[in-house]
Amino acid sequence: MGRIQQAFRGALLMDFWSAFGLGMRYFFAKKATLNYPFEKGPLSPRFRGQHALRRYANGEERCIACKLCEAICPAQAITIEAEPRSDGSRRTTRYDIDMTKCIYCGYCQEACPVDAIVEGPNFEFAAETREELFYDKAKLLENGDRWEREIAKNLELDAPYR
C-alpha cells in the first residue's frame, strides 16, 4: 500500500502543489516590511532623534544657560558657555553638541527646566565628514525652527507621562 500511495503522490505532484500553495498564501498576504527610503514607519512621540534648540513664540531662544544638560550628559557631549545680559539674565554664547559622542539617552531633554533642548523627529542625518556632526548653536536653532510644530505636538502627547 505504501508504494502505491507514494506513486500516486508523485504522479500528482502533491509536494509541489503543497509548497506552491504555501508560497501563494504569503505572496498575497500583507507585507511585513517597508520599502524604506520611500515609505517610513510611524514614530513614537518619545522618539529620540536629532537634537534641536527651541525658541519661544516671540522668537527668543528658550535656553537660560543653567547648564543642567551639560552636567547630566553621561557622554560629556554638550559644551555650553554663557554670559550675563544687560537685564541680568544669562544667555548662551556657545552651545555645542558633539554628535559622535552622544548616546541619545534623552537626559538632556529631561533635565532642561524650560524644554529648550529636545531630541527631534529626524533620524536621517548621515554625514560625510566628522566635522558635520559637531552641532553649534546656529545649527541646533535651525533644527528647532524646522521641526517646531512636530516637536510641540510630541511634547504635548508625552505630557501626561512627564
UniProtKB/Swiss-Prot annotation:
Listed EC numbers: 7.1.1.-
UniProt domain 4Fe-4S ferredoxin-type: residue ranges: 53-83, 93-122
InterPro entries, A to Z: 4Fe4S_Fe-S-bd, 4Fe4S_Fe_S_CS, NADH_quinone_OxRdtase_chainI
Keyword 4Fe-4S: yes
UniProt remark on cofactor binding: Binds 2 [4Fe-4S] clusters per subunit.
Any GO BP: aerobic respiration
Domain of life the protein comes from: Bacteria
Binding site for [4Fe-4S] cluster 1: C63, C66, C69, C112
Binding site residues for [4Fe-4S] cluster 2: C73, C102, C105, C108
Gene Ontology molecular function: 4 iron, 4 sulfur cluster binding; iron ion binding; NADH:ubiquinone reductase (non-electrogenic) activity; quinone binding
Subcellular location: Cell inner membrane
Membrane topology field: Peripheral membrane protein
GO cellular component: plasma membrane
Reactions mediated catalytically: a quinone + NADH + 5 H(+)(in) = a quinol + NAD(+) + 4 H(+)(out)
Principal localisation: membrane
Protein family: Belongs to the complex I 23 kDa subunit family.
Subunit field text: NDH-1 is composed of 14 different subunits. Subunits NuoA, H, J, K, L, M, N constitute the membrane sector of the complex.
Protein name: NADH-quinone oxidoreductase subunit I
Gene: nuoI
